[in-house]
Amino acid sequence: MLAVAVLAAGKGTRMKSNLPKVLQPLAGATLVERVLASARNLRPERRLLIVGHQAERVEQQLSAVDGLEFVLQQPQNGTGHAVQQLLDPLANFEGELLVLNGDVPLLRAETIDQLVSTHRSSGAQVTLLTARLDDPTGYGRVFADEQGAVSSIIEHRDCSEEQRRNNLTNAGIYCFNWTALAEVLPKLSTDNDQGELYLTDTVAMLTKAMHVEVADPDEVNGINNRQQLAQCETMLQERLRHHWMAEGVTFVDPASCTLSEGCQFGRDVVIEPQTHLRGRCQIGDESRLGPGSLIEDAELGRGVTVVMSVVREASVGDGVCIGPFAHLRPAAVIGNNCRIGNFVEVKKSTVGEASKVNHLSYIGDAELGASVNVGAGTITANYDGVNKHRTVIGDGSKTGANSVLVAPIQLGNKVTVAAGSTLTKNVPDGALALGRAKQLIKENWAGPQG
């Protein structure tokens, strides 16, 4: 059996934020959510999150995570003290305990799998993750033989000059035999410079220790300040882009684009510079996004073009052209082969197949049929100051430029609305609707003379 414990109680004072450090966002997810996800493939029987600073806020953020147990550490007195809080919740547990840090979000699932499998096959009481650093200053050094057996861990300040040449460091991630660990946890001492209980001290108390060296030291980078958060964002974005380029996606200027882990792309998608995808996005084959676009929690079909536009929580069919400077807001549903042009906003509306809203229009709380042509400057006036109302436009209808449709209103199929009309009443199929003042011409009118 396996239990996973994530240390998430720290204050993160160097972040200088009102938000708990483990809830800082990174490529569309919080730090601690990424850590929890990295161990998902192991299918642990128990998952425990050790909380402390702003515990209620952390618990609220993660309340939807199935099977996650919250354990309070109060006060926060070191990593050893944090794991001591598991003695009661895991009193009857037998198996391995994997200890992860809530502020180390780049750790790969494959690395964790290797750590746990090595621990199980070696018969060790503890297996720790290690990393070779170009500059190990300040890190505890791990001394081990060629078979991976750890003889000692010595803090940097206690190392001799020769020992400091060893750049194998402790990453602070462990897999323990829980029964063995539970016996030594009460023996931890605060006899150190910080007056805290260190989980590292348990390694010397256990009979057999092994280590697994991480292939990429960047995986175990911890985040303590905004600079490190930005560095991890850069590394994670590069990882995501490399993954999707290997799957057939083209990035014209990779470094200028950002993704979230929830994005999915078909083949031959092209992403132009300064394009950003957030949340859960589904992008169909041969679509072209950007330049200068934001797409968030949206579903786009095959062969969609989005140019300098914003698409949020919308569903877009195949072959749709969007932009430039269009805005699809939540609950916009655009049918196949539509055109949503420049300075058009669509909110909570359905636009039927092959319809065109080409210029300077607002479509809100509306239902447009197939092959509708919306003239430049057409507005669906959906709000009466208290309530929103719907506009329905039938198949094959067209509105002239600068028309206002005052909802609630329904236009039948193949209706024509004359330019400049303001309509307040329903229009039957095939009718021409005019709602404007009669044009007057006064000849020989020179106007006021100054």
Swiss-Prot record:
Protein residues bound to Mg(2+): 103, 224
Main location: cytoplasm
Region (N-acetyltransferase): 248-450
Pathway: Nucleotide-sugar biosynthesis; UDP-N-acetyl-alpha-D-glucosamine biosynthesis; N-acetyl-alpha-D-glucosamine 1-phosphate from alpha-D-glucosamine 6-phosphate (route II): step 2/2; Nucleotide-sugar biosynthesis; UDP-N-acetyl-alpha-D-glucosamine biosynthesis; UDP-N-acetyl-alpha-D-glucosamine from N-acetyl-alpha-D-glucosamine 1-phosphate: step 1/1; Bacterial outer membrane biogenesis; LPS lipid A biosynthesis
Region entry Pyrophosphorylase, spans: 1-226
Keyword Transmembrane on entry: no
Keywords: Acyltransferase, Cell shape, Cell wall biogenesis/degradation, Cytoplasm, Magnesium, Metal-binding, Multifunctional enzyme, Nucleotidyltransferase, Peptidoglycan synthesis, Repeat, Transferase
SUPFAM superfamilies: Nucleotide-diphospho-sugar transferases (SSF53448), Trimeric LpxA-like enzymes (SSF51161)
Residues annotated for acetyl-CoA binding in this entry: 376, 382-383, 419, 436
EC numbers on record: 2.7.7.23, 2.3.1.157
Location of region: Linker: 227-247
Cofactor, free-text remark: Binds 1 Mg(2+) ion per subunit.
CDD domains xref list: GT2_GlmU_N_bac, LbH_GlmU_C
Summary of the function given for this chain in its UniProt record: Catalyzes the last two sequential reactions in the de novo biosynthetic pathway for UDP-N-acetylglucosamine (UDP-GlcNAc). The C-terminal domain catalyzes the transfer of acetyl group from acetyl coenzyme A to glucosamine-1-phosphate (GlcN-1-P) to produce N-acetylglucosamine-1-phosphate (GlcNAc-1-P), which is converted into UDP-GlcNAc by the transfer of uridine 5-monophosphate (from uridine 5-triphosphate), a reaction catalyzed by the N-terminal domain.
Catalysed reaction equations from the record: alpha-D-glucosamine 1-phosphate + acetyl-CoA = N-acetyl-alpha-D-glucosamine 1-phosphate + CoA + H(+); N-acetyl-alpha-D-glucosamine 1-phosphate + UTP + H(+) = UDP-N-acetyl-alpha-D-glucosamine + diphosphate
Protein name, UniProt field: Bifunctional protein GlmU
Catalytic residues (UniProt): 359
Protein location: Cytoplasm
UniProt family annotation: In the N-terminal section; belongs to the N-acetylglucosamine-1-phosphate uridyltransferase family.
Oligomeric and partner information: Homotrimer.
Cross-referenced InterPro entries: Bifunctional_GlmU, GlmU-like, GlmU_C_LbH, Hexapep, MobA-like_NTP_Trfase, Nucleotide-diphossugar_trans, Trimer_LpxA-like_sf
Cofactor names: Mg(2+)
GO biological process, one term: regulation of cell shape
An example Gene Ontology CC term for this record: membrane
The gene coding this protein: glmU
Binding site for UDP-N-acetyl-alpha-D-glucosamine: 7-10, 21, 73, 78-79, 140, 155, 170, 224, 329, 347, 362, 373
